[in-house]
Amino acid sequence: MGGDCISSIGICDISDKVTARWEFEENQIAYPWAYDALPEVDVVKPEDLFKCDVFVFVASKGIPPVGSGVKDVRMYQFENNSKIVAQYARQARTEHFKGLFAVVSDPVDPLAKTAWLESNKDENGVFDLKGLRPEQVQGFGLGVMNCARGLLCEARRTIFHSF
């Protein structure tokens, strides 16, 4: 389950307490009698984030509280999360990262696009294509939007079939 081809999983957070907790908890996950089947989980310093083959962006600034009046949660998330992903994309550029930059945080597609665009701007904000290549940036959605659209289509199909 990864232990044979993944040497370790690195985690990083702005809080040392969070990373210590994650490292402790994740290293307790194992299969009975196959304790080395899963890769070790290690804390990685921010300056070492891109010394890897795959960087997975799963950070989030959060979601608006219920009743806040925010109509489009995805755009609220994008406004906040795009600033975070841009920072890491610029770091990937600076460090000449050659691996996969995977985006899992919502909204996946706009954040993946932001990562690619921001990595390809110089220090003056000029777009120069000297950052991540398009094929290096991949969005990995959790299927939530697809499922929501599927439910909506099913509901509409049911309504139209009732006539």
Question: Model segments located where?
Answer:
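Hydrophobic/aromatic residues located in beta-strands of well-ordered beta-sheets
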Residues: I9, F101-A102, V137
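Short mixed-charge
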Residues: P32-D42, N124-Q136
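Conserved N-terminal Rossmann-fold NAD(P) cofactor-binding segment
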Residues: S8, C12-C52
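Gly/Ser/Thr-rich loops at beta-strand to alpha-helix junctions
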Residues: S15-K17, V103-T114, G141-N146
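Rossmann-like NAD(P)-binding element
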Residues: D36-L100
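Conserved S-adenosyl-L-methionine
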Residues: G2-S8
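Substrate/ligand-engaging "lid" and interaction regions
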Residues: G125-D128, Q136-F163
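Short, electropositive alpha-helical surface patch
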Residues: V108-L132
